[in-house]
Amino acid sequence: PVLVDVTKDVTGAKYEYNACTPAAITPKVDTIKDKDIETAVQMIKDAKKPFIFTGGGTIISEASKEVTELAHRIDAPVCDSLMGKGGFSGEDPLYTGMLGMHGTKTSNLGVSGCDLLIVLGARFSDRVTGNTKTFAKNAKILQIDVDAAEINKNIVVDASVVGDEKEVLKRILAEVPEMRHPEWTAHISE
């Protein structure tokens, strides 16, 4: 252990400095495979009870607009992780709150009852999943993440797309039609 003791006069002093902002890392778009997009689009089209789980990747990718457009296009409720807070508006009628042990009953029951869980830039931490054997056991899981190491890491998924979330969603949105699930969204909003 090391102790760095900074005196009060130094911490309270005013000084000039030049802020150093690291350059953002731009993920490669060419990692996105056409067949993975096709699979994702088909899973979304086949879903009767879709649910979106968004995480910190939405924030990093600046994909809030695309997540909102997808949610409204496919009529899917949206929950988030702590790292995903702000990636989808808390004022939106499709928003259900956080998922997991610190989450809402609506989000947790929604994930338990959905037939397709679309995971956007979120890892499956133990605070979100609880028992991994029973997490979203009735759902197919589609995971979209820039980090291939996160795919199937804690939860085995049915399909995945590796790539920048914003770019992946743009490609999915180009192919997904307007869909309505009135019974499902009514059930979630109860």
Residue locations for each model-derived region?
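Phosphate/pyrophosphate-binding active-site segments
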Residues: A19, Q42, A47, N138-E190
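Glycine-rich beta-alpha junction loops
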Residues: V6-G12, G56-T58, A148
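Phosphate/diphosphate-binding loops
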Residues: G100-I151
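Anionic-ligand anchoring segments at beta-strand to alpha-helix junctions in alpha/beta enzyme folds, i.e.
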Residues: I32, V41-L117
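Conformationally flexible catalytic loops at phosphate/diphosphate-handling active centers
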Residues: P1-D46, P182-T185
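Short internal beta-strands
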Residues: L3-D5, D75-L82, L142-D145
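Short acidic, glycine/serine/threonine-rich loops at helix termini
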Residues: A13-A19, E62-E66, S89-L94, V128-T132, ...
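Short beta-strand segments
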Residues: L3-T7, F53, V119-G121, D145
